[in-house]
Regions:
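4′-phosphopantetheine-dependent carrier domains
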Residues: 1-174
Length: 174
């Protein structure tokens, strides 16, 4: 029902579907639809709690953290709020320029966040990311977007320092 007013305009090319889903009617945004899945909010909260436990013993050492394409500013804010009193270098990456710009707008008040492009479907050699340099990689519902999720996880592992930690949650079909 919510999509019906936009369908004609999207099909005829007079409306950009991404704008409809992400700007015109936020109730249609995929991240809003995800919140309706039973257990989704609890899963995100669990990830945030794990991050809290991880940083408890490391407040003096600056942490290098990278978040991969969450595309949900509310979740990123939860994460950044946990890190408020922690020495951290935080990088938010996405494979889409559109979503990276949206994240920059949504998170403009967080000065410690850097924004970079990263496409896990391309060779890591051709991208600007420093390999083996992150203490923590955070991925919330992002890796399933890759054609080859196993290869994407291998590339994520290349970002981690030795003994680095991947905090990840993703939807799977059972």
């Amino acid at each position: 029902k919510k999509l019906k007013p936009y369908l004609k305009h999207m099909v005829t090319g007079n409306e950009v579907p991404l704008d409809v889903f992400y700007q015109k009617d936020s109730a249609l945004a995929p991240n809003m639809l995800l919140r309706r899945i039973p257990g989704y909010e609890e899963t995100v909260e669990r990830l945030v709690q794990e991050l809290k436990l991880l940083i408890e013993g490391r407040r003096k050492e600056p942490l290098q953290i990278i978040e991969i394409g969450t595309r949900d500013a509310a979740i990123t804010r939860q994460i950044l709020n946990v890190l408020e009193d922690v020495s951290v270098a935080y990088t938010y990456v996405d494979s889409s320029k559109y979503f990276l710009q949206e994240a920059e707008k949504e998170l403009a008040g967080y000065e410690r966040v850097e924004f970079e492009m990263l496409n896990l479907e391309e060779s890591m050699d051709k991208q600007q990311m420093a390999l083996h340099s992150y203490d923590v990689v955070i991925s919330v519902n992002a890796l399933h977007r890759n054609i080859d999720a196993v290869d994407a996880v291998k590339k994520v592992a290349e970002l981690l320092k030795p003994n680095g930690i991947l905090l990840m949650t993703d939807l799977v079909v059972r």
